[in-house]
């Protein structure tokens, strides 16, 4: 009799996070978007080879695109496809969501950035956010509040 081999998959895992965005912006609203990817990109994402730093969302012809994100190709990638690490990737959002984001981005001071990329089942999802930039004194205040919360938790724990 053969024994069944149990393979554990991490389907709910985070692939990449944009910690810089959480530091530099006030997050107003979050959205979940799918991504249109090529085969070699999915293989690289399974290996966790993605960087969201310096990336943002652009809108062109009523569609949303992820610009500036890097997906590093694996060394074992297909030889007949030339991988481009910083390719602009189309985001899959509903027309209502695109309209909502586009209307807010056209207002002064608002921007749209990716926060995280993760697996949802067998699909790759991108968490994007409508954000407003922080000034230097806002960053200092946020850091001061975070330090106070940490100290308060440390005092309460004793």
From Swiss-Prot:
Family annotation (CDD domains): SmpB (cd09294)
Coiled-coil spans in chain: none
Keywords annotated in UniProt: Cytoplasm, RNA-binding
Pfam families: SmpB (PF01668)
One GO term describing the cellular component: cytosol
Localization per Swiss-Prot or TrEMBL: Cytoplasm
Role according to the record: Required for rescue of stalled ribosomes mediated by trans-translation. Binds to transfer-messenger RNA (tmRNA), required for stable association of tmRNA with ribosomes. tmRNA and SmpB together mimic tRNA shape, replacing the anticodon stem-loop with SmpB. tmRNA is encoded by the ssrA gene; the 2 termini fold to resemble tRNA(Ala) and it encodes a 'tag peptide', a short internal open reading frame. During trans-translation Ala-aminoacylated tmRNA acts like a tRNA, entering the A-site of stalled ribosomes, displacing the stalled mRNA.
Protein name: SsrA-binding protein
């Amino acid at each position: 009799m053969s024994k069944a081999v149990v393979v554990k998959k991490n389907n709910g895992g985070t692939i990449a996070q944009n910690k810089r965005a959480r530091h530099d912006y006030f997050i107003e609203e979050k959205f979940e978007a799918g991504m249109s990817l090529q085969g070699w990109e999915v293989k690289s994402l399974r290996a966790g080879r993605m960087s969201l730093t310096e990336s943002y969302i652009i809108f062109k012809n009523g569609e949303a695109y992820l610009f500036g994100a890097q997906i590093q190709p694996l060394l074992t990638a297909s030889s007949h496809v030339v991988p481009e690490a910083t390719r602009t990737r189309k985001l899959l959002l509903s027309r209502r969501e695109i309209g909502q984001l586009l209307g807010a981005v056209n207002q002064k001071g608002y921007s749209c950035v990716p926060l995280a990329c993760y697996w949802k089942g067998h699909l790759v999802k991108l968490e994007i956010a409508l954000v407003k930039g922080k000034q230097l004194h806002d960053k200092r205040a946020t850091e001061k509040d975070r330090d106070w919360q940490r100290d308060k938790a440390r005092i309460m724990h004793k």
